[in-house]
């Protein structure tokens, strides 16, 4: 049986469209992979710089310490907003959408708490560490099948929640805490982001060489 030319042409065109769609999907997936790696490196770098500033200038100046304490949750809100936007938007990333809201509310709460005492500030950070940690854990679990290095994010989220409970307990002590109490928590976060970024970078390089 002879196949007509229009049918052959349509079949070839359809195959080309499928191949183009597949290629576009692969490129988009690769772009997201590279973005997430850069994102983790950026988060690690910011947290490391924040810790250094907190332990130096923040320990010498109350004004600098206050600014750093406000900036930290504000940055987390902005970072989650940008990351969600690069991965389908807030509607498709519910845990990050909630995290943006939680971090934004925390920023406002820190501003209010600074007018009271550092105990209040530490308590606010404790609640935030619990909620943001669990939300980070949820995001990592959701990304587990499609993105590498999420085991580090799961550990980070879990330890953040534990640290939050510890902060709340510390906040009730008579001794006034300082920004140094929070710097250790931020440093641990920087470590996990760096581990995840390096892990992903190594896997991506191996994949390109294969």
Question: Could you describe each region identified by the protein language model?
Answer:
Residues 6-89, 205-210:
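N-terminal topogenic module of multi-pass integral membrane proteins
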Residues 180-196:
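Small-residue-rich transmembrane alpha-helices that serve as helix-helix interface/gating elements
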Residues 131-146, 163-170, 196-200:
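Alpha-helical transmembrane segments in multipass membrane proteins, preferentially the mid-helix core
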Residues 105-155:
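Membrane-proximal helix-loop-helix units in multi-pass membrane proteins
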Residues 43-50, 99-107, 156-163:
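Core segments of transmembrane alpha-helices
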Residues 61-74, 117-130, 183-187:
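Structural signature of hydrophobic alpha-helical transmembrane segments
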Residues 51, 107-116, 159-177:
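Hydrophobic alpha-helical transmembrane segments in multi-pass integral membrane proteins
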Residues 90-102, 149-156:
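Cytoplasmic-side transmembrane-helix entry/capping segments in multi-pass membrane proteins
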């Amino acid at each position: 049986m002879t196949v007509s030319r229009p049918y052959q042409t349509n079949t070839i065109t359809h195959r080309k469209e499928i191949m183009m769609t597949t290629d576009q999907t692969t490129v988009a997936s690769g772009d997201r992979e590279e973005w997430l790696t850069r994102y983790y490196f950026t988060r690690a770098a910011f947290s490391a710089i924040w810790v250094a500033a907190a332990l130096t200038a923040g320990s010498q100046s109350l004004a600098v310490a206050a600014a750093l304490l406000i900036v930290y949750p504000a940055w987390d809100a902005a970072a989650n907003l940008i990351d969600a936007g690069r991965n389908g938007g807030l509607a498709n990333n519910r845990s990050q959408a909630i995290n943006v809201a939680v971090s934004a509310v925390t920023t406002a709460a820190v501003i209010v708490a600074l007018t009271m005492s550092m105990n209040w500030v530490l308590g606010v950070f404790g609640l935030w560490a619990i909620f943001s940690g669990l939300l980070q854990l949820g995001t990592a679990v959701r990304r587990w099948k499609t993105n590498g290095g999420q085991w580090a994010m799961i550990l980070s989220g879990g330890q953040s929640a534990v640290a939050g409970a510890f902060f709340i307990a510390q906040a009730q002590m008579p001794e006034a805490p300082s920004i140094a109490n929070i710097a250790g928590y931020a440093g641990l976060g920087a470590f996990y982001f760096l581990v995840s970024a390096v892990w992903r970078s190594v896997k991506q390089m191996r994949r390109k060489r294969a």
